[in-house]
Swiss-Prot record:
Organism: Mus musculus (Mouse)
Descriptive protein name: Gamma-crystallin A
Domain notes: Has a two-domain beta-structure, folded into four very similar Greek key motifs.
GO MF term list: structural constituent of eye lens
Gene name in the database record: Cryga
Location of region: Connecting peptide: 84-87
InterPro entries: Beta/Gamma-Crystallin, Beta/gamma_crystallin, G_crystallin-like
Biological processes per GO annotation: eye development; lens development in camera-type eye
Miscellaneous comment in the UniProt entry for this protein: There are six different gamma crystallins identified in mouse lens.
Domain called Beta/gamma crystallin 'Greek key': residue spans: 2-40, 41-83, 88-128, 129-171
C-alpha cells in the first residue's frame, strides 16, 4: 500500500493527516487541503466524500499547493490508493453498450483524436490494470479513474459527456 500526507496549509504547513489506505470521508481529519506529499504509491483524490466529484490523480512527489494537482479548490474529501499492476489493456468503443469497436490499447495515448480520429468514446472495457482518462489531449482536464471492469456508458466512469482526450496507464515509476 501507499502513503500520502495531507496538509491544511500551502507549503506542507498546518495540521496534517497521514493516510495509507482508502478513505471514503476525510472531513473528520482536516477541513481543507492545500498541500500534499505522496511518499509511495499512486492515489486518486476526490473533492467530495464517498469518491464523488472532481478526481485528481497523484503519483509519488510533493504538491505544495492545490494548483500543482490541477485542483479547483482546497476541497479533498476522499481518497483511494490505486493498486499497481504490470500489464494494462483497455478496449474503447465509439458507441454505448460496447458497439462500434475502436481499438484495444496497452500503452498510454496522449491524443485519442490523433490516433483514432474520434473526440468521443461512449463505452469501455478495462481488461487489465488501472487507467486515468483525461477529457483533453496531453493528459489535461477532468480526470477519471478506470479500474478493471465494464463501463457501458460514460456515466459509468462519472463523466457528464463522452469527451475523451487522452488515456494514461497507472504506473508507479518512481
Amino acid at each position: 500500500m501507499g502513503k500520502i500526507t495531507f496538509y491544511e496549509d500551502r507549503g506542507f504547513q498546518g495540521r496534517c493527516y497521514e493516510c495509507s489506505s482508502d478513505c471514503p470521508n476525510l472531513q473528520t481529519y482536516f477541513s481543507r487541503c492545500n498541500s500534499i506529499r505522496v511518499d509511495s504509491g499512486c492515489w486518486m483524490l476526490y473533492e467530495r466524500p464517498n469518491y464523488q466529484g472532481y478526481q485528481y490523480f497523484l503519483r509519488r512527489g510533493d504538491y505544495p499547493d492545490y494548483q500543482q494537482w490541477m485542483g479547483f479548490s482546497d476541497s479533498i474529501r476522499s481518497c483511494r490508493s490505486i493498486p499497481y499492476t504490470s500489464s494494462h489493456r483497455i478496449r474503447l468503443y465509439e458507441r454505448d453498450d460496447y458497439r462500434g469497436l475502436v481499438s484495444e490499447l496497452m500503452d498510454d495515448c496522449s491524443c485519442i483524436h490523433d490516433r483514432f480520429r474520434l473526440h468521443e468514446i461512449y463505452s469501455m472495457h478495462v481488461l487489465e490494470g488501472c487507467w486515468v482518462l483525461y477529457e483533453m489531449p496531453n493528459y489535461r482536464g477532468r480526470q477519471y479513474l478506470l479500474r478493471p471492469g465494464d463501463y457501458r456508458r460514460y456515466h459509468d466512469w462519472g463523466a457528464m459527456d463522452a469527451k475523451v482526450g487522452s488515456l494514461r496507464r497507472v504506473m508507479d515509476l518512481y
